[in-house]
């Protein structure tokens, strides 16, 4: 009886060790890719991973000349059908346009005319800054002060008073910066700064 219980105990221990051995062997198995060896199990593997950085840099430099030029982004101007879009240099950026910027925090102009992503330009004079430079400066430096923020309120001059010009044309002496969270101004308040 002792021998049968001893044999049974040995079989149970052998079975338990074989189950535990399988789970540890599954953990120690090398993954299919050699890229994961140093990160997943550095103690079980003595292999050194050597990244072929010279080959990557060389491939990047040799392929660089064959890559197309980048024509993407927010505010992309247009695609002209008369020329290949790959021959133009980088034409991307936030709000990149030939006319004044009409976006952002505190934008002064009320008319927002977004450009589409892909269209041909019929009137190139409209996008030229040379012929309407005065209009551009008037729009850019108009009499409207900086007024931005959440809950901003406009300001009015008291009855009978006129806006006094500052150093430059269209500079208004008055509350130029009206910003803040929920900042409200009553109509009867005189705004003197």
From Swiss-Prot:
Serine amide found at: 165
Keywords carried by this UniProt record: Amidation, Cleavage on pair of basic residues, Neuropeptide, Secreted, Signal
Positions annotated as propeptide: 26-64, 78-84, 109-139, 169-193
Tissue specificity as recorded in UniProt: Allatostatins A1, A2 and A3 are expressed in brain, antennal lobes, optical lobes, gnathal ganglia, the retrocerebral complex and thoracic, abdominal and ventral ganglia. Allatostain A4 is expressed in brain (at protein level).
Signal peptide boundaries: 1-25
BP GO annotations: neuropeptide signaling pathway
Residues found modified as Isoleucine amide: 74, 94, 105, 150
CC terms in the record's Gene Ontology section: extracellular region
Signal as UniProt keyword: yes
Cell compartments where the protein resides: Secreted
UniProt similarity note: Belongs to the allatostatin family.
Function according to Swiss-Prot or TrEMBL: May act as a neurotransmitter or neuromodulator.
Name listed for the protein in its UniProt record: Allatostatin A
Protein's organism: Camponotus floridanus (Florida carpenter ant)
